[in-house]
From Swiss-Prot:
Source species taxonomy: Bacteria, Pseudomonadati, Pseudomonadota, Betaproteobacteria, Burkholderiales
Name of the protein: 3-demethoxyubiquinol 3-hydroxylase
Top-level division of the source organism's lineage: Bacteria
Gene Ontology BP term (one): ubiquinone biosynthetic process
Record localization: Cell membrane
Note on how the cofactor is bound: Binds 2 iron ions per subunit.
PANTHER family: 5-DEMETHOXYUBIQUINONE HYDROXYLASE, MITOCHONDRIAL, COENZYME Q10 BIOSYNTHESIS PROTEIN 7
Amino acid sequence: MLFDELISEFDRGLRSIAGVSRMSRPVPQPAAAAPAELSAAERKHAAGLMRVNHVGEVCAQALYQAQKFATSSSELKEMFEHAAREEEDHLAWTAHRLKDLDSRPSLLNPLWYAGALAIGVVAGRLGDKVSLGFMAETERQVESHLDSHLSELPAADVESRAIVEQMRADEVKHGKTATDAGGIELPMPARMLMRAASKVMTSTAYYL
């Protein structure tokens, strides 16, 4: 059984890196049609932002996989799995949007995935309360990051905006779930380190 789970998670990891993840929910659609075509500069900027969001979802898959295997609680395993499935939708949605924008995922996805997997292993080994606290803080920072993207996306890019809005709603839910399950607040140095690492990732992934 464990071997089957390892094969399944390995497959998920490969799909995350390759950008061929499955979606269980359709791509969110805007309520109204775009008011105008995006200019070349707007398409390039939107693609950079969506590439950053795609990298975030690659990292989310790695984090949840590591945390799922680190816990001995069947309830928490299911919680991490449920969150990972919803994040896999995000991964597929952002990949779909990048293709629509004639762009591509980050060339550094294997590196992002490996780094996030290592962080998830460390968080998981510190115990369930810390692991859940790490999940909650991650989701809070992602929520803030998505808020900034909603303000930065071109006004005419209603397709990307619809995706980001649904992603944000899911992230808020995941963060609350982690807190309700017993996640503790991480110390300020840990939160600052997470923000610094996120800044490096987002600044790099926008271009690469």
